[in-house]
């Protein structure tokens, strides 16, 4: 965990303690000494989340955190994201998983061609979409 030591000037033992705590929090405390190649895709994603948390960020950015995972591993990462949301962490989540977005968001922004097409509370956006494009997108994700 070089970043917190170098960037934040935190003492190594303190960083190691927080790293172990965050690895436990994301459910891979038993993998403290594992190399990335020894971890599954879901474990690698959760290790990345733990690394980010060690920097004590004000906000976390997730860019399609579950897109390359099989369904079982996907659920592991979703559980961690839901737990972080329940803690009140600020997160910006880019995803095509509308169920995840609805479950963890307090504000949703739907982009089309790089522009904001629609935004608001998840219930409003998902239950009563105003734009044809969002309605089309939601119907295609429900059918999939």
Label for each model-derived stretch:
Residues 35-39, 43:
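Conserved ABC ATPase signature
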Residues 71-73:
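Helix N-cap at the start of a conserved alpha-helix in ABC-type nucleotide-binding domains
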Residues 54-58:
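A short, proline-enriched helix->beta-strand linker immediately N-terminal to the Walker B motif
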Residues 101-103:
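A short, surface-exposed alpha-helical micro-motif characterized by mixed small hydrophobic
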Residues 95-96:
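H-loop/switch region of ABC-family ATPase nucleotide-binding domains
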Residues 60-63:
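Catalytic Walker B motif of ABC-type/P-loop ATPase nucleotide-binding domains
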């Amino acid at each position: 965990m070089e970043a917190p030591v170098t960037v934040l000037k935190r003492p190594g033992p303190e960083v190691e303690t927080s790293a172990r705590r965050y690895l436990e929090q994301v459910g891979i405390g038993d993998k403290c000494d594992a190399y990335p190649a020894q971890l599954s895709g879901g474990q690698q994603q959760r290790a990345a989340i733990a690394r980010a948390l060690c920097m004590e960020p004000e906000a976390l950015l997730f860019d399609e955190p579950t897109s390359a995972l099989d369904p079982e591993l996907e659920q592991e990462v979703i559980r961690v994201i839901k737990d972080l949301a329940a803690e009140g962490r600020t997160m910006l989540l880019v995803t095509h998983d509308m169920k995840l977005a609805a479950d963890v968001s307090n504000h949703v922004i739907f982009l089309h061609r790089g522009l904001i097409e629609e935004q608001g509370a998840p219930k409003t956006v998902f239950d009563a979409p105003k734009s044809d494009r969002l309605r089309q997108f939601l119907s295609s994700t429900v059918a999939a």
